[in-house]
């Protein structure tokens, strides 16, 4: 439980198993290579508050992080926004990432290969009225399976090569 440690965020939950193997941390050049990492059987809740202490940090974040293999199994994360304005939840059966590169100085983030299996995602704006059909304020996606290559987020734009995508939404929409 991080209550009181981060000015506008509380993170609590439990970690079943966490493993990180790294053979390359270069403090002088601000680079990290994570060879293998995994998170299993974990539950995390993130609560964002509407008031935060002013950030007085003067140094820039220059880190470049390379991730060879990252795996998440049987884990979930729930995020609640200030004033209960939005709720986001993800229950991951398995998520695997291969060859990720994250340049924090340039705000450039890439993943060569991502696979998601047997997962669920929920997006909810609790104060909005429910609508018939596909309701963008109350989404619940189940049976989510996806394979994506060449994911890139840079300059507020995202691109990806979607190899496969399967999902069901509670309104009856199915993508196969």
Per-segment meaning from a language model:
Residues 1-176:
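N-terminal targeting/secretion presequences
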């Amino acid at each position: 439980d991080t209550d009181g440690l981060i000015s506008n965020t509380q993170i609590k939950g439990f970690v079943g198993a966490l493993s990180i193997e790294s053979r390359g941390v270069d403090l002088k050049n601000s680079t990290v290579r994570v060879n293998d990492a995994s998170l299993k059987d974990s539950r995390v809740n993130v609560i964002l508050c509407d008031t935060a202490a002013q950030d007085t940090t003067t140094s820039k974040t220059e880190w470049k992080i390379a991730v060879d293999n990252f795996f998440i199994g049987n884990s979930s994360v729930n995020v609640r926004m200030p004033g209960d304005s939005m709720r986001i939840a993800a229950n991951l059966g398995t998520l695997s990432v291969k060859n990720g590169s994250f340049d924090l100085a340039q705000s450039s983030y890439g993943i060569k290969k991502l696979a998601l299996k047997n997962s669920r995602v929920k997006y909810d704006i609790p104060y909005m009225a429910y609508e018939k059909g596909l309701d963008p304020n109350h989404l619940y996606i189940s049976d989510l399976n996806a394979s994506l290559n060449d994911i890139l987020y840079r300059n507020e734009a995202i691109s990806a090569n979607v190899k496969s995508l399967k999902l069901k939404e509670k309104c009856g929409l199915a993508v196969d």
